[in-house]
């Protein structure tokens, strides 16, 4: 059983004193105060945990500098922006491909028909969430639809799927009963089986939320492991010794999915980001030792 929390709020200057007492080197106290006033102590704490020698006493390793923590934070912030840009492209394409392949064969309202679901309970849950997400939408094409039509209760799939969340979209795809249609969508992204695409969509929804809510990516353990095919039709990875719940495999599949657009500069942009932040260690992202020798 836990104990009552009794700590009081302290000033930014007092926070700086605590960090100094724990062995962190702070060259410019004034800049450090400004940084903490903008970023906040506990948001940065997730980044400096890697620099601690002891996670119980929170003593820092010898030679650790506040500037290195800020550099890691800055790298992480820019990486989120890079990923979010790629995910936006992927997300729009996924919606379009699912609408295209499912609607032509299964109609405009397949998402409301439990005959197209593998699990009835998940179908009911998904539909309830879709209703709420559509109700919350203020997009012109949704409000205009309801102004004109009152049946069925929801707009057709080519409107509805544009306003549901990435997580809901992932669950809809996963619970769809027709494997042939799911394969068709997966093949649009260069995958030979929908099980990989289903897994990647689930991971993508989590990763998207991390980026959208400014959550830390480096040194993070993700809740879902992406299924990684050993062979692909184009250049892919050969070393699968990485830790599955780190960012590295997610970066790999984001690059692959983003290849649906011709101007895919994701790897080039990522490498440039690493060059701009030489103090950042790729092992914090789960990269294998010889990642630069990978075909991808």
Predicted segments with their positions:
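Acidic/aromatic/glycine-rich contiguous surface patches that form carbohydrate-binding/processing clefts
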Residues: 214
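Extended intrinsically disordered or low-complexity regions, especially N/C-terminal cytosolic tails and loops
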Residues: 1-206, 218-296
